[in-house]
Curated annotation (Swiss-Prot):
This is Putative glutathione-dependent formaldehyde-activating enzyme. Gene3D superfamilies: glutathione-dependent formaldehyde- activating enzyme (gfa) (3.90.1590.10). The keyword Lyase applies. It holds the Pfam family GFA. It comes from Phaeosphaeria nodorum (strain SN15 / ATCC MYA-4574 / FGSC 10173). Pathway: One-carbon metabolism; formaldehyde degradation; formate from formaldehyde (glutathione route): step 1/3. NCBIfam families: formald_GSH (TIGR02820), PRK05417.1 (NF003829). Residues 19-165 form the CENP-V/GFA domain. The lineage of its organism: Eukaryota, Fungi, Dikarya, Ascomycota, Pezizomycotina. PROSITE patterns: CENP_V_GFA.
Length: 190
């Protein structure tokens, strides 16, 4: 089976609940883009969508979120560009090596105020481990053989990760709550 993701293939390393953050780096050999996170990530998960950056050969990304005010570009920010300005998540990638350093939502959205990051871009240890796998069936749209998808789901199960073809129930509930509040069907003070 191809690589699920380097952070998952050989077993998941538990994170440190007291971890305070660290630096992310692009893959350039010099003049690396550096992003500093002043907190650990939340909702860290494997994602099979076609938009997320994935390490070479991996079927999934591993992506978590931090509050926008916990992220700062601390070196070579001039090398960043937005990959797709029409996407809900504005993925900021290095122009030279193509690595996505962070994704920011700029329009009205349930997750506005959170930045999406890939902790494998850090040398620091202690980041929250993956909590679940999302958009699993989306790898089929990208060319993965449908008759092998059950083996992918089984690999996640063996690692203790629940698989979804959307986000986790908690995140889907947050989206539904946001949508209900925006439509006026739910009180804005829950």
């Amino acid at each position: 089976m191809p690589s699920i993701h380097p952070l998952i293939d050989n077993g998941i390393t538990k994170g440190d609940e007291h971890f305070k953050g660290g630096k992310l780096y692009c893959h350039c050999p010099s003049n690396k883009v550096e992003v500093t996170l002043s907190s650990n990530v939340a909702h860290n998960h494997a994602c099979g969508c076609s938009k997320c950056w994935k390490p070479k050969g991996a079927l999934f990304s591993v992506v978590g979120v931090v509050p926008v005010d916990a992220l700062s570009v601390t070196a070579n920010g001039n090398k960043l560009h937005v990959v797709d300005s029409s996407a809900a998540i504005q993925r900021n990638a290095c122009k030279d090596c193509g690595v996505h350093l962070f994704g920011r939502i700029v329009n009205d959205h349930p997750f506005k105020g959170l930045d999406f990051v890939h902790v494998e871009l850090s040398d620091s240890k202690g980041w929250q481990e993956p909590q679940f796998a999302a958009f699993v069936s989306s790898i089929i749209e990208q060319g993965f053989p449908p008759n092998q998808i059950d083996a992918v789901r089984e690999k996640f199960r063996k690692e203790g990760l629940q698989t979804y073809d959307v986000l986790s129930p908690t995140l889907m509930d947050l989206i539904a709550t946001y949508t209900g509040q925006k439509s006026g069907k739910l009180s804005s003070k829950l």
